[in-house]
Amino acid sequence: MEPVFRTLEIAVSGATRAIGTRITYYGLENIPDRGGAVISINHTSYVDWFPAALAAYQRHRRMRFMIKTEMQDVKIVNFLIKHSGTIPVDRRAGAGAYAIAVERLRAGEIVGVYPEATISRSFELKEFKTGAARMARDAEVPIVPLIVWGSQRMWTKDHPRNMGRKKIPITVAAGPPLYAAESIDETNAAMREAMNTLLHKVQEEYPHPEGAYWVPRRMGGSAPTIDEARVLEEAELAERARKRAEREAKSRR
C-alpha cells in the first residue's frame, strides 16, 4: 500500500487543484500499465517531477525517481526518500544507485530519469548522460520519452518561485516506447531525437508570450541560448567546486 507514497499522491493532487494548475496529458497509453520501464524526462524546473508523477498516477503506476543525494540533508525530504522508493544518487559515485535502479526495473517498476542531469536554463534539450540508455539495456525494459512543459513558469533556475494560485497550464506528453540498442550512443541519439520532436510539438501548441524569461530564444523568448546556458552552467560548476574545496580544506584543519 505504501502509506507515505499514497499520502504524497493525495497531497500533490490536492495542491495541484488548489493552485489552479491545469495539466493536459497526451500519449499516456505509452506508459506501460505493468512491467518495468525507464521514463526519460526533460528537465526545465525544480517541480517538473510532480506533473511526471501524476502522469504515471493516471496509469495507476508509481514512478521511482532518482534524486541527488544532497537532498537527504533536508530531514523531511530524507524521510520522503526513504518511504517513497526514491533512489538517491551521488553524482561522484553513482554505481550503487545505478544498480538499485536496474534492480527496480527488473522487478517491474518504472523509474523516472532526467538524462540531462541538471535543469536546462535554455529550456532546450541539453546533452544527455548515458544512464537512462544503459539502465534500459541492462534491465531489458523500454524507454518512454516524457516531456513536461510549463512547469518552468513555477520555479526554475535563476528566477523566483511563482507558486501561488496562478492557473499555470502544464502539458505532459509521452511518446512511443523505444528499445535500447547494444550501442549506448545509438540509443541515446534515438532517445534525444524522439524527445526533441515531442518537445517541439508540445511547444508549438502552448502559448508563448514574446520576451518571456521561460520561453526559448528561438521562439521569441528571453531565455539564454544553448551556448549561453552552457557558459552559465560551467561558471556554476566552478563555483560549486571552489566552495567544496574550501569546506574540505576547513575540515582538514
Regions found by a protein language model. Give the residues of each.
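Catalytic core of membrane glycerolipid acyltransferases/transacylases, capturing the structured
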Residues: 32-93
